[in-house]
Amino acid sequence: MNILRLLLATLLVCLCLLTAYSHLAPEEKPRDDRNLRSNSSMNMLDLSSVSIVALNKKSKKISRKEAEKKRSSKKKASMKNVAQPRRPRPPPPAPCVATRDSCKPPAPACCDPCASCQCRFFRSSCSCRVLNPTC
């Protein structure tokens, strides 16, 4: 019986050490000069070549004009968005549930058009909540 306990204790210690060892970060091996040279040459070959092209004056002027056109079109689009009036909210349905009140599924819809019935805890507690305040 005493030998069995000693064997089980040894097995338990070995399992603990094995588990701890498996969770350790692997150590990096020191690299010598040959490994560094071969890795750097491989990395240089893997990169795609990049060609640098100088722009002439005409292409610079065209790109500036295009940029100005884009800026003016963005300004016009933003002015149109500001000028448009917001659409009116639809009137609430006659029998409705106020915001933050209980709205279990047989209950009518929420009064606020931006609110929705949100249920929690397996639909045991439901309430009307506004999810998007900028509706």
UniProtKB/Swiss-Prot annotation:
<feature type="disulfide bond">
    <location>
        <begin position="114"/>
        <end position="135"/>
    </location>
</feature>
<dbReference type="InterPro" id="IPR036836">
    <property type="entry name" value="Agouti_dom_sf"/>
</dbReference>
<feature type="disulfide bond">
    <location>
        <begin position="119"/>
        <end position="126"/>
    </location>
</feature>
<feature type="disulfide bond">
    <location>
        <begin position="96"/>
        <end position="111"/>
    </location>
</feature>
<keyword id="KW-0960">Knottin</keyword>
<feature type="region of interest" description="Disordered">
    <location>
        <begin position="56"/>
        <end position="101"/>
    </location>
</feature>
<keyword id="KW-0325">Glycoprotein</keyword>
<keyword id="KW-0732">Signal</keyword>
<feature type="glycosylation site" description="N-linked (GlcNAc...) asparagine">
    <location>
        <position position="39"/>
    </location>
</feature>
<keyword id="KW-0964">Secreted</keyword>
<keyword id="KW-1015">Disulfide bond</keyword>
<comment type="function">
    <text>Involved in the regulation of melanogenesis. The binding of ASP to MC1R precludes alpha-MSH initiated signaling and thus blocks production of cAMP, leading to a down-regulation of eumelanogenesis (brown/black pigment) and thus increasing synthesis of pheomelanin (yellow/red pigment).</text>
</comment>
<dbReference type="GO" id="GO:0005615">
    <property type="term" value="C:extracellular space"/>
</dbReference>
<dbReference type="Pfam" id="PF05039">
    <property type="entry name" value="Agouti"/>
</dbReference>
<dbReference type="InterPro" id="IPR027300">
    <property type="entry name" value="Agouti_dom"/>
</dbReference>
<protein>
    <recommendedName>
        <fullName>Agouti-signaling protein</fullName>
    </recommendedName>
</protein>
<feature type="signal peptide">
    <location>
        <begin position="1"/>
        <end position="22"/>
    </location>
</feature>
<dbReference type="GO" id="GO:0032438">
    <property type="term" value="P:melanosome organization"/>
</dbReference>
<feature type="disulfide bond">
    <location>
        <begin position="110"/>
        <end position="128"/>
    </location>
</feature>
<dbReference type="GO" id="GO:0042438">
    <property type="term" value="P:melanin biosynthetic process"/>
</dbReference>
<dbReference type="GO" id="GO:0005184">
    <property type="term" value="F:neuropeptide hormone activity"/>
</dbReference>
<dbReference type="GO" id="GO:0031779">
    <property type="term" value="F:melanocortin receptor binding"/>
</dbReference>
<dbReference type="InterPro" id="IPR007733">
    <property type="entry name" value="Agouti"/>
</dbReference>
<feature type="domain" description="Agouti">
    <location>
        <begin position="96"/>
        <end position="135"/>
    </location>
</feature>
<feature type="disulfide bond">
    <location>
        <begin position="103"/>
        <end position="117"/>
    </location>
</feature>
<dbReference type="GO" id="GO:0009755">
    <property type="term" value="P:hormone-mediated signaling pathway"/>
</dbReference>
